Amino acid sequence: MSSLFVEGMPLKSANESCLPASVKQRRTGDLRRLNHHRQPAFVRGICRRKLSGVSRIELRTGGLTLPRAVLNPVSPPVTTTKKRVFTFGKGNSEGNKDMKSLLGGKGANLAEMASIGLSVPPGLTISTEACEEYQQNGKKLPPGLWDEILEGLQYVQKEMSASLGDPSKALLLSVRSGAAISMPGMMDTVLNLGLNDEVVDGLAAKSGARFAYDSYRRFLDMFGNVVMGIPHSLFDEKLEQMKAEKGIHLDTDLTAADLKDLAEQYKNVYVEAKGEKFPTDPKKQLELAVNAVFDSWDSPRANKYRSINQITGLKGTAVNIQCMVFGNMGNTSGTGVLFTRNPSTGEKKLYGEFLVNAQGEDVVAGIRTPEDLVTMETCMPEAYRELVENCVILERHYKDMMDIEFTVQENRLWMLQCRTGKRTGKGAVRIAVDMVNEGLIDTRTAIKRVETQHLDQLLHPQFENPSAYKSHVVATGLPASPGAAVGQVVFSAEDAETWHAQGKSAILVRTETSPEDVGGMHAAAGILTARGGMTSHAAVVARGWGKCCVSGCADIRVNDDMKVFTIGDRVIKEGDWLSLNGSTGEVILGKQLLAPPAMSNDLETFMSWADQARRLKVMANADTPNDALTARNNGAQGIGLCRTEHMFFASDERIKAVRKMIMAVTPEQRKAALDLLLPYQRSDFEGIFRAMDGLPVTIRLLDPPLHEFLPEGDLEHIVNELTADTGMSKDEIYSRIEKLSEVNPMLGFRGCRLGISYPELTEMQVRAIFQAAVSMNNQGVTVIPEIMVPLVGTPQELRHQIGVIRGVAANVFAEMGLTLEYKVGTMIEIPRAALIADEIAKEAEFFSFGTNDLTQMTFGYSRDDVGKFLPIYLSQGILQHDPFEVLDQKGVGQLIKMATEKGRAANPNLKVGICGEHGGEPSSVAFFDGVGLDYVSCSPFRVPIARLAAAQVVV
């Protein structure tokens, strides 16, 4: 018999986990009768029903006997939005897992766990719609909501046979936030609500003074910080001062008398900090706590987190009110957090942490560094066995890896929360592949399970040679989020953001992170903390972003004021270089070399499923043979954009030849300079054709304005350098620069306008393309060249350039004795071209939308100057996204849709794609698939992301 606590009342209950399977199976026959004759569902630190075995039947898997939940009837989703409070308790729920938008992720999953018979503390969930009404009502509870909350509270009190504020049979509550999308640590939680001087005395009489006053001082601290806005540090100072006076290091070493005295000191903090006393009325406490959770939805840290993670369209947060269970009732109690599989690697093994004699926030907040879950198996074997069983049940029910919070009170297990677990890219891919192999999910579900950001993480670098830095390892913490990070040390979130804005790589070093640090955590290359476990705030947030993190590094001492941290006698100061290995927890002095990651077998398997599912082809933007090889290795199906101008910067000889061409006055001078460039271009094209053997290569003719090839600096410096490069006199240079100067070069002398004005420029580039194509074909390479004319705004421009291209092609084929098939098309990047796409399509064999310039010209935003006002537009909600990163579907997107439809109407064989960086942005890819484009083209490193995004559109 284990002693359990029912809100101030110690109870005894049998441990059903010890019952023989035959007894449990017989009890299932009583299910219907018991459902009509329910006993109180004692929860969260309260005992289960004596016959709780009825909620399970045995499932034999090989030699292992595992329990399986029997699904009790679940209430269908509520169709009216008028209901704002939903109750739940073991075997009964007014909600379910499909109601996340209304109940939040936490509330929906609590309802679901209760419905399938797991031991969940009874409670109630206030809907996200109520939060929205609260915000619209001037941050006041909307009419009638408080009465609905009290009605829900009556249900909980009846289930518990306890009352809020009754010292003899007190009901204590937790009040937690829970949005539809998980936002770890961003919103607020209050535990042990309902305590005051009278209630704590009653609690002490029944459950022990130390436990009672430990709960009280925790509540005073948390309520003061979350609800009253009192800095946590003011309470922490009192705690640390008392521990110093007593000569102890751990909170658990404080006596009952110490904790009672500490509670009095905490109450004084209210008066000192706020000028008002701690509110003793439990219902007033509850009302204030609900308000605080609703307020936390609109807090700066929550807003920043949603902005960083592009979370939009949510109504607000739900509020979950549950009766408390206690992990701080001694050495037979504890609390923990676990994942049903390793979230970093995906390994099928429980991954979590456990703290004996502690409450849940101690683990999540990183206040104490917890121990491995194995500790629980050793000291609480029965509770651990049931926990393992519950993990199996939940994975089979949700068909996903789950993140679970639990408490053990006097050897009794209570499930406090479950949600889909956040995972790294590596973990996501392995979990998806393993679950397909296990028969839990199909490949289409697996494709939806891996986010495009997960693949982005897998493309991040690792250390080039881990063995080379071993002598520089100065400390080892917990490997909280894998990958490698190299940067300069900073000690505040603000500094991390500042350094990032300056183009510097920063490592954020903190004693422990808090939700206020999210901006700096996002800006930093990596995160190092002295405290906190694998499920601390820093670890969870970093893993969600694929950010390298080492947590709980007990060897370091952080001094924020001095901007240094120490490891023994070694001092590391702000600006020093540091490297982190988030996969091993190693902290390494200096700037270590990084190397790109290699694709794993799991990733190759997963990407093959994505490729089978998608319709849209994925090409790459690549300008060099190395870029082309990288693109092919990442799964590109061709080159959608090869920018010839980038080749000109590859060497001093090339750029000097380009400058001679620009400075040329006569066609003869210009041709002489171009003849110098031709072998360079031909060599580069040969390398690209070789790398893309058998795949199409789309080469764009010269596009940028000529000034981009001139030296930087003041006019005198430019003239001196051009004089040296070209051999012309200064007067000639000055005269030529004056003639070439433009007020707005991005709308001036560039693109096809260059090729029309200087046909010899187009001739040189096309000659280099076809000479390279024939040469490679003669070497056994299958070459599929496509030539793209940029910045076309009229069909006449395209017709002119096609004439030049076909003339040169005929000459080269005649000279080299071989004819190859090729295509000629154009970029659609001027709004006028989109409007008359039907006319242009009569000349072109393919369209490629240049969404960078099309966005620039449609909005009238200069890409070079948009940084001056775009942050203001985004912060004020004038724009929801940077249109150069996320396609403007209502404006630019409609031009693309119209041009595609008109172009294909005029030329049914027209191939249509997109080659701006939008080609690698998932929501943009979904749009391109929807309007029927044939392909997208993006940077080589974003090719896997585009492949997955294209697959997710159709599954």
From Swiss-Prot:
Coiled coil: none annotated. It comes from Flaveria brownii (Brown's yellowtops). Homotetramer. This is Pyruvate, phosphate dikinase, chloroplastic. The N-terminal domain contains the ATP/Pi binding site, the central domain the pyrophosphate/phosphate carrier histidine, and the C-terminal domain the pyruvate binding site. It is an enzyme of class 2 (transferase). One of its GO terms (molecular function) is kinase activity. The modification Phosphothreonine is found at T535. Mg(2+) binds at E829, D853. No loss of activity below 10 degrees Celsius. NCBIfam families: PRK05878.1 (NF004531), pyru_phos_dikin (TIGR01828). Formation of phosphoenolpyruvate, which is the primary acceptor of CO(2) in C4 and some Crassulacean acid metabolism plants. The reaction takes place in three steps, mediated by a phosphocarrier histidine residue located on the surface of the central domain. The two first partial reactions are catalyzed at an active site located on the N-terminal domain, and the third partial reaction is catalyzed at an active site located on the C-terminal domain. For catalytic turnover, the central domain swivels from the concave surface of the N-terminal domain to that of the C-terminal domain. A short cytoplasmic isoform may be produced by alternative promoter usage. PANTHER family: PHOSPHOENOLPYRUVATE DIKINASE-RELATED, PYRUVATE, PHOSPHATE DIKINASE 1, CHLOROPLASTIC. It catalyses: pyruvate + phosphate + ATP = phosphoenolpyruvate + AMP + diphosphate + H(+). The gene is PPDK. Pathway: Photosynthesis; C4 acid pathway. The lineage of its organism: Eukaryota, Viridiplantae, Streptophyta, Embryophyta, Tracheophyta. Its EC number is 2.7.9.1. GO terms for cellular component: chloroplast.
